[in-house]
């Protein structure tokens, strides 16, 4: 029975940390924490990069300016080598995606109890209630562990894919790609259409689920470490955080890179 109680306690701890602060019901449920943190991190990106742009000097750059210039040059070189269209929107879009997703992913490195506990205290709950696991204040601080956020990002990319395909190839050219490829034979048009439609829909699905799955798994492991090891969690927590430092920028890069590739394919003229 003691083991069962322990499992329930750990299960409740995990469930609490993986539950979003929400308003509304059903389809119209809004995850307030995801929306708030994504907006805050977006503003951090915009304001910090804007501050660097305003203070940029031709002389020896400061550390933050050098960091920003390194990121901008890296993204610009990636776009130039991958995107073969003529749109001037792609490089700023790629930079926004990379930095914004990176900042959201970096929230995974904050100790799992820190911000939820602070939110519960601000909401008026006592430390005794929080320590007993009876807090009713929920907060997920990593927006990319919310599948709604990753789907929203991928749907934006999907909309741009359709936009560039129709803009460059025309609606007729876009539809012809769906039914006349890969087999340009009239009696196989129906098969082509199904095949290409599945392939088209799979792109935003895989884009969103890849980011969500990797970050959700990482957050779950952090929570398991915190919930099962107590005071002994710190060494393992830091070891996992060190490993996760590779995953966090890698997933941001993959999301950006696939976005560029998809938009490049959409912009090709046939």
Curated annotation (Swiss-Prot):
It is a multi-pass membrane protein. Its main location: membrane. GO terms for molecular function: proton-transporting ATP synthase activity, rotational mechanism. It holds the Pfam family ATP-synt_A. The keyword Hydrolase does not apply. One of its GO terms (cellular component) is plasma membrane. GO terms for biological process: proton motive force-driven plasma membrane ATP synthesis. InterPro entries: ATP_syn_F0_a_bact/chloroplast (IPR045082), ATP_synth_F0_asu (IPR000568), ATP_synth_F0_asu_AS (IPR023011), F0_ATP_A_sf (IPR035908). The chain crosses the membrane at residues 27-47, 90-110, 147-166, 182-202, 211-231, 238-258. Keywords: ATP synthesis, Cell inner membrane, Cell membrane, CF(0), Hydrogen ion transport, Ion transport, Membrane, Transmembrane, Transmembrane helix, Transport. It is found in: Cell inner membrane. The keyword Transmembrane helix applies. Gene3D superfamilies: ATP synthase, F0 complex, subunit A. Coiled coil: none annotated. Belongs to the ATPase A chain family. F-type ATPases have 2 components, CF(1) - the catalytic core - and CF(0) - the membrane proton channel. CF(1) has five subunits: alpha(3), beta(3), gamma(1), delta(1), epsilon(1). CF(0) has three main subunits: a(1), b(2) and c(9-12). The alpha and beta chains form an alternating ring which encloses part of the gamma chain. CF(1) is attached to CF(0) by a central stalk formed by the gamma and epsilon chains, while a peripheral stalk is formed by the delta and b chains. Key component of the proton channel; it plays a direct role in the translocation of protons across the membrane. This is ATP synthase subunit a. It comes from Pseudoalteromonas atlantica (strain T6c / ATCC BAA-1087). The lineage of its organism: Bacteria, Pseudomonadati, Pseudomonadota, Gammaproteobacteria, Alteromonadales. The gene is atpB.
């Amino acid at each position: 029975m003691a083991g069962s109680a322990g499992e329930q306690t750990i299960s409740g701890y995990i469930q609490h940390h993986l539950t979003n602060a929400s308003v509304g019901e059903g389809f119209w449920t809004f995850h307030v924490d995801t929306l708030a943190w994504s907006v805050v991190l977006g503003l951090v990106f915009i304001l910090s990069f804007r501050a660097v742009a305003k203070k940029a000097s031709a002389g020896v750059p400061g550390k933050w300016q050098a960091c920003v210039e390194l990121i901008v040059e890296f993204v610009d070189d990636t776009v130039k080598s991958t995107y073969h269209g003529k749109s001037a929107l792609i490089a700023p879009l790629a930079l926004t995606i990379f930095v914004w997703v990176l900042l959201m992913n970096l929230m995974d490195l904050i100790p799992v109890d820190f911000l939820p506990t602070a939110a519960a205290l601000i909401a008026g709950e006592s430390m005794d209630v929080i320590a007993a696991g009876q807090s009713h204040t929920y907060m997920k601080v990593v927006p990319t562990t919310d599948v709604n956020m990753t789907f929203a990002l991928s749907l934006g990319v999907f909309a741009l894919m359709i936009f560039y395909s129709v803009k460059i190839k025309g609606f007729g050219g876009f539809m012809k790609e769906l039914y006349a490829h890969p087999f340009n034979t009239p009696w196989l048009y129906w098969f082509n259409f199904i095949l290409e439609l599945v392939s088209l829909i799979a792109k935003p699905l895989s884009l969103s689920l890849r980011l969500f799955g990797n970050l959700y798994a990482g957050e779950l492991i952090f929570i398991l470490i915190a919930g099962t090891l107590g005071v002994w969690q710190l060494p393992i927590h830091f070891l996992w955080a060190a490993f996760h430092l590779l995953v966090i920028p890698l997933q941001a890069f993959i999301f950006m890179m696939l976005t560029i590739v998809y938009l490049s394919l959409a912009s090709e003229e046939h």
